[in-house]
Amino acid sequence: MTWQNDYSRDYEVKNHMECQNRSDKYIWSPHDAYFYKGLSELIVDIDRLIYLSLEKIRKDFVFINLNTDSLTEFINRDNEWLSAVKGKQVVLIAARKSEALANYWYYNSNIRGVVYAGLSRDIRKELAYVINGRFLRKDIKKDKITDREMEIIRMTAQGMLPKSIARIENCSVKTVYTHRRNAEAKLYSKIYKLVP
């Protein structure tokens, strides 16, 4: 089975964030050749572990690569990309620094599951587990970002300073820094490094 063929339709989302549905694959970001190749090989490799046909997976699923290169777009436009994939079975592939964000989107939207791409885990089994629909809230392995932390992350990603954020959120600057520190602990990184 090959996952490469012609394009059948494209979805455009503001500022170059696009989701491309090819007749035989559905990934986001479509320009991430390494993600595409690796995911294709993994899915073919786990064919015997999954209950659904490969054709159904190609037709009904969206696999989203949440890595540090794409986080700014996903954070700034989460309502847009969530709307663009409505009706699809969304699987988030989360790098270590994006696990808490993946958990936030799992809890706050219609995400099928999260595959934690940490080095110590068997990604094949985790991917099959999610595709087979067995991923549940009890499977969340890390903290999730709170709604307030997410608002502060979004505003920081847009270049807003803590004082401006405090004014908008109707809280003190100290509170903004506290939420930011809590989010950074969950993300294993400073926010400004994740969303330059």
Curated annotation (Swiss-Prot):
For whether the record's keyword set contains Chloroplast, the answer is no
Question: Among the entry's GO cellular component annotations, what is one?
Answer: cytoplasm
Q: Where in the cell is it found?
A: Cytoplasm
Entry keyword set: Activator, Cytoplasm, DNA-binding, Transcription, Transcription regulation
Keyword DNA-binding among record annotations: yes
SUPFAM superfamilies membership: C-terminal effector domain of the bipartite response regulators (SSF46894)
GO molecular-function term, one example from the UniProt record: DNA binding
Q: Which residues form the HTH luxR-type domain?
A: 138-196
Q: Which PROSITE patterns match?
A: HTH_LUXR_2
Coiled coil residues, start to end = none
Can you cite a GO biological process for this protein? regulation of DNA-templated transcription
Which sections of the sequence are annotated for DNA binding? 162-181
Q: What induces it?
A: Negatively regulated by H-NS. Positively autoregulated. Also positively regulated by IHF.
InterPro entries with a match to the protein in the record? Sig_transdc_resp-reg_C-effctor, Tscrpt_reg_LuxR_C, WH-like_DNA-bd_sf
Q: Which domain of life is it from?
A: Bacteria
Q: Which family does it belong to?
A: Belongs to the EcpR/MatA family.
Q: What does this protein do?
A: Part of the ecpRABCDE operon, which encodes the E.coli common pilus (ECP). ECP is found in both commensal and pathogenic strains and plays a dual role in early-stage biofilm development and host cell recognition. Positively regulates the expression of the ecp operon.
Question: What name has this protein been given in UniProt?
Answer: HTH-type transcriptional regulator EcpR
Q: What is the lineage of its organism?
A: Bacteria, Pseudomonadati, Pseudomonadota, Gammaproteobacteria, Enterobacterales
